[in-house]
């Protein structure tokens, strides 16, 4: 009887060890991720990637749209599944916003509508091709002092701006900065069938001399990220944050 108990114990331990070994190997090397992200940044500042044509007439609107469709077709052929579309550029945007003016990249005239909604169009075309569209939001830099974005912010929220070198930036230490950026991200999430919000330049300017501790600086940036996260998730919990 003791021999049988001993044999059963050995078999049991061997089974556990084998299972643990298989689990250890297979957990990381053989089980593929549910969905691999293959993403590209689609840059709109200065029309770097798109648009190449300014939209201000029916003909140029269609040409601008076709440029994007051609790009998305190429990305689809390259097996991309996620497009990070630069949506907030430098205190300016590529959709009709209650907070910030139009960027000049779409119409050729800063502050002016191109005659259609580029963000809505991009989302629809991405989804037609089975690709996600994430709004790429440049967070802290807002461009040169005489730019459309800084002028708008100077008029509405001068307390949120600081000048470093030749550029203007939002003040990360201000709670109102976190709220302002969160409002933009909430607006996008509420109004569009967006798949994600992608925060860029979510940091202090590289050339800025901090007069606070690095720990406090990290906390200030974390406050912005958390405020944006909470605002987005309150609207649509499934929208991704990156």
Regions found by a protein language model. Give the residues of each.
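Active-site-adjacent "subsite" loops/lids of carbohydrate-active enzymes
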Residues: 35-37, 43-66, 124, 134-191
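Bacterial Sec-dependent N-terminal signal peptides
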Residues: 1-22
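Aromatic- and glycine-enriched glycan-recognition loops and surfaces
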Residues: 57-78, 105-129, 219-223
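Aromatic-lined carbohydrate-binding/catalytic grooves of carbohydrate-active enzymes
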Residues: 78-114
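Aromatic- and acidic-residue-enriched segments that line the glycan-binding/catalytic groove
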Residues: 93-108, 141-165, 202, 207-216
């Amino acid at each position: 009887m003791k021999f049988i108990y001993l044999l059963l114990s050995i078999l049991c331990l061997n089974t556990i060890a084998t299972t643990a070994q298989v689990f250890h190997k297979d957990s990381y090397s053989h089980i593929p991720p549910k969905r691999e992200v293959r993403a590209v940044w689609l840059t709109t500042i200065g029309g770097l990637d798109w648009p190449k044509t300014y939209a201000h007439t029916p003909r140029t609107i269609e040409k601008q749209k076709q440029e994007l469709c051609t790009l998305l077709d190429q990305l689809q052929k390259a097996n991309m599944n996620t497009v990070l579309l630069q949506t907030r550029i430098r205190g300016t945007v590529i959709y009709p916003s209650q907070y910030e003016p139009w960027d000049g990249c779409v119409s050729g005239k800063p502050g002016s509508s191109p005659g259609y909604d580029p963000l809505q169009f991009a989302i629809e075309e991405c989804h037609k091709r089975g690709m996600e569209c994430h709004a790429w939001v440049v967070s802290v830099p807002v461009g040169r002092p005489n730019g459309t974005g800084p002028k708008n912010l100077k008029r509405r929220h001068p307390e949120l701006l600081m000048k470093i070198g030749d550029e203007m930036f939002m003040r990360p230490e201000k709670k109102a900065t976190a709220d302002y950026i969160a409002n933009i991200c909430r607006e996008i999430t509420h109004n569009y069938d967006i798949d994600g919000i992608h925060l860029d330049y979510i940091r202090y300017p590289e050339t800025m001399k901090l007069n606070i501790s690095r720990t406090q600086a990290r906390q200030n940036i974390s406050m912005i990220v958390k405020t944006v996260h909470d605002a987005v998730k309150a609207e649509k919990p499934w929208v991704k944050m990156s």
